[in-house]
Regions:
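Active-site neighborhood of HAD-like aspartate-dependent phosphohydrolases
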Residues: 1-50
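Charged phosphate-binding loop/patch that engages nucleotide di/tri-phosphates or the phosphate backbone
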Residues: 2-8, 139-172
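Short hydrophobic segments within beta-strands
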Residues: 12, 69-71, 116, 136
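Conserved Rossmann-like nucleotide-cofactor binding loop
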Residues: 16, 23, 74, 121, ...
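Substrate-recognition element of Asp-dependent hydrolases with the DxDx(T/V) motif
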Residues: 54, 59-83, 97
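Anion (oxyanion) recognition and catalysis
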Residues: 85, 109, 127
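Donor nucleotide-activated moiety binding/catalytic core segment of transferases
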Residues: 90-112
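Acidic, Mg2+-coordinating phosphoryl-transfer loop and its flanking beta/alpha structural elements
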Residues: 114-152
Length: 172
């Protein structure tokens, strides 16, 4: 990859660049609120909560401009753009998949070269669909298969891991 042909990166939002999990646990601290179907219900109750979505703290700022954002959020894109602007992050197209168990690759394949996500299942589904994907290392995904893992949102690390993934999978 060179600067004449930049890597088109699809970047997940929650727990990739924003601290969704920390904000969620502050609002829903009970152990019973940490079960998947309860999380889905609680997130649905936050759909119109502008303050929640616009005030998520920044986990990590990428040192590149993503081509697109890919998320499974159900809130207004306006809230997302406002949060991006608040943290001086680039405003780029936002692709939202409303079904939590859906495959982001169905939405973004052909619109990017690689997906970066914190979810092992999102990364695995993308790869199984023929879309290169990298797992950003976060505390909640330490027990899973390493897949193609990166430790930071650094463009050089991403390029290296992307090229290694293509070579490993025979996609180059």
């Amino acid at each position: 990859m060179n600067s004449c042909n930049p890597l088109r990166i699809a970047l997940d939002l929650d727990d990739t660049i924003f601290d969704f999990w920390g904000a969620y646990k502050a609002l829903f601290p009970r152990e019973s609120d940490l079960v998947e179907h309860i999380i889905t219900r609680n997130v649905a109750s936050l759909r119109y909560n502008k303050e929640f979505w616009e005030n998520l703290s920044l986990l990590e700022k990428p040192n590149f401009e993503p081509h697109i954002y890919a998320t499974k959020r159900i809130n207004s894109k306006v809230y997302t753009r406002n949060c991006l602007a608040k943290h001086n992050l680039p405003i780029r197209p936002i692709y939202q998949m409303y079904y939590q168990h859906g495959n982001k690759a169905d939405l973004i394949k052909g619109k990017c070269d690689v997906l970066i996500d914190d979810s092992i299942s999102n990364v695995q589904m993308a790869i199984n669909s023929g879309l290169p994907a990298l797992l950003i290392d976060r505390p909640h995904n330490q027990n899973g298969n390493p897949l193609f893992r990166i430790c930071s949102l650094d463009i050089d690390e991403i390029r290296f891991a992307y090229e290694l993934e293509l070579e490993t999978l025979g996609w180059n």
